[in-house]
Amino acid sequence: MKKLILLIRKYISYAKDLANKNTTNYERFKNWMHAYIAYKSNESKFNPTYLPKYEQGQIIFVDFGCGIKHEFSYPHYAIVLNAHDRKKNDLLTVVPLTSKKPKHNQLKNWEHEIAYPIQNLLVDKVTNDFNLYNTKYTELRDKIIELGKIGPTIDNHEFTKQYSKLIEIGVNEIYANNKDILEFADKMSKGSIVETNQIKTISKSRIIFPTKKSHPLYDIKVHPSDLSIIQYKLVNHLVADTNKIDITK
C-alpha cells in the first residue's frame, strides 16, 4: 500500500510540474492516463472479431499513447502494414503518418512523402459517396424539391436566396456526416509524411477509427506505388541494406 501511495504522489508531482511547463503536453498526458486505465480495465473484454479486417495500405487513426523523447505519441494517423489481417488477430503493425512541416523540406532516409495526395483521396471519397437520395439527406432533398415547385412563383432574387441557403445546409450536412475524413483532408493539405523508423505493432484496441466498415475512412488506402516505396524503405533502412544483400546465395 505504501508503494502505491508513493506512486500516486509521484504521478501528482509530475503532473503538476508538466502543467506548469507545458499545458498542451499536460492535457495530452492527462487524457492518455484516462485512456490507458480504460484500455487496461477493458482488456479482458476486448474482442477484435467485432472489428473489420484491415487491409495493407489502409489508413487508420490510432492512439499511440504517451511515448518517450522522439517516439510517436498520442492519437495519430497510421498506415496498416499487415499483408493478411484476420479478425481474430488482436495485433496490427502500422507505420505513422504525419502532416508535412517545414522540417520535412529535406527528408531523412527513412521518411517518404506520399506522392498521390491523401487530401485528394479523401475529398474524392466524400464526393463519390454523396447521394442526395440517402436517408441522411431526406429533409434537404424534400426542401430542394419544394423549392423547384415554387420557383416559377417567386422572383429571381428570392429564389437565389433560398437556393443558396439550401446549398449551405447541404454543405454543412455533408461535413457533419464526414467530419473525421474532412478534418483529416484539411490536416494533410500541405502533404503527408510516412516515418518508417517509427514502425510499431499495436493492440487493435488502440484503433480510434475506423472500427466499422460503414465509417467513411474505412476503405481509404495509399496508392500502391507509395506502399511499395514504404516497404522498400522499411527493408532498406531498418532490416538490411539492400545494396549489400546477395540474393544469389
Positions of PLM-derived features:
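Short, conserved beta-turn/loop elements at beta-strand boundaries and strand-helix junctions
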Residues: 83-89, 100-101, 201
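A residue-level detector for short acidic-glycine micro-motifs
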Residues: 80-82, 96, 198
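Short aromatic-glycine-enriched beta-strand elements
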Residues: 76, 89-95
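Loop/turn positions that initiate beta-strands
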Residues: 57-59
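C-terminal terminal-subdomain/extension
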Residues: 1-34, 43-44, 52-55, 105-249
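Short, surface-exposed secondary-structure edge patches
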Residues: 48-53, 69, 83, 185
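Short, surface-exposed secondary-structure boundary micro-motifs
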Residues: 64-65
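Short beta-strand-centered aromatic/proline hotspots
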Residues: 73-84
